[in-house]
Regions:
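N-terminal acidic leader/helix
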Residues: 1-19
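N-terminal intrinsically disordered, cationic/polar leader segments
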Residues: 2-8, 27-30, 34-63
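Short, conserved loop-to-beta-strand elements that form functional interface hotspots
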Residues: 21-27
Length: 63
């Protein structure tokens, strides 16, 4: 395995996930779709060809 190539691929994927997720969250908050002061979020990472299922849950203060 080429460590440098692997690390760059992972970073590129995570950057894409982070940027697009932030946009979706901001859009939901700005549109008024969030009820209450906290947005409860969950991100699930899965892979088609590997036994990966990783869940991250958190609260985001919106007001």
């Amino acid at each position: 395995m080429d460590e440098d190539r692997f690390n760059m691929s992972v970073r590129k994927f995570l950057k894409k996930v982070g940027v697009t997720s932030q946009r979706v969250i901001e859009e939901a908050v700005r549109s008024g779709a969030v009820k209450g002061d906290v947005l409860k979020v969950r991100m699930t990472l899965t892979a088609e060809n590997a036994p990966i299922e990783h869940v991250i849950e958190d609260d985001i203060a919106v007001r």
